[in-house]
């Protein structure tokens, strides 16, 4: 979905661990220079509002001037913040885009372009963003295919978060 589409237009994906505090989320969003935030569920929130991503971004959203939209994925509680938009409305924003524009962006991607930023846990200060290129991901996919056998139609379970390299690899590539 949004992960692949972001990379297909030449933009860079950065993920945030579901355990990050509001301050850590703010730091990563600013450091990555993100323009759009896609906000989903925290599978480990146990119904506690303070653990829900929605409640971690709200306290710092006012300090994130460069954010254009916070896109709320399906079944995420809507807020009255002007930057928050639900998934269906966000998709409708692109309804006038010509498909040839999308293909042109896709064709302009260079294998050495940054595809994603993976942030470290920040055990010695603020998290550091590690750049991974499209070539990095291609290499990882090809090596993984040599070791792991995935057949079309099979199902698997991945418990790794998208903020983890292997989580991104098996869930999105």
Regions found by a protein language model. Give the residues of each.
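Conserved AMP-binding/adenylation subdomain of ANL enzymes
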Residues: 138-173
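Short gly/ser/thr-rich secondary-structure transition/capping motifs
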Residues: 17-19, 96-100, 138-139
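Conserved AMP-binding A3 loop
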Residues: 115-139
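Structural core segment of the AMP-binding/adenylate-forming
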Residues: 8-92
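Conserved pre-ATP/AMP-binding loop-to-beta segment of ANL
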Residues: 85, 91, 95-119, 126, ...
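Short acidic, glycine/serine/threonine-rich loops at helix termini
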Residues: 83-85, 130, 168-171
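Hydrophobic alpha-helical segments in the ANL/AMP-binding
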Residues: 1-16, 25-26, 144-145, 166-173
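Conserved S/T- and glycine-rich ATP-binding loop of Class I adenylate-forming
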Residues: 6, 37, 114, 120-123, ...
């Amino acid at each position: 979905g949004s992960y692949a589409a972001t990379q297909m237009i030449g933009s860079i994906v950065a993920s945030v661990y579901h355990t990050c505090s509001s301050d850590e989320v703010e730091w990563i969003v600013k450091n990555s220079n993100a323009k759009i935030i896609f906000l989903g569920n925290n599978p480990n929130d146990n119904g506690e509002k303070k653990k829900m991503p929605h409640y971690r971004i709200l306290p710092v959203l006012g300090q994130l001037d460069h954010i254009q939209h916070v896109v709320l994925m399906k079944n995420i509680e809507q807020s009255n913040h002007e930057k928050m938009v639900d998934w269906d409305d966000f998709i409708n924003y692109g309804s006038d885009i010509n498909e040839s524009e999308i293909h042109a962006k896709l064709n302009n991607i260079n294998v050495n372009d940054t595809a994603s930023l993976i942030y470290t846990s920040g055990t010695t200060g603020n998290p550091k963003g590690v750049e991974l290129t499209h070539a990095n991901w291609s290499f990882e996919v090809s090596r993984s295919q040599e070791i792991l056998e995935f057949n079309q139609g099979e199902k698997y379970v991945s418990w790794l978060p998208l903020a983890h390299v292997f989580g991104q690899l098996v869930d999105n590539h």
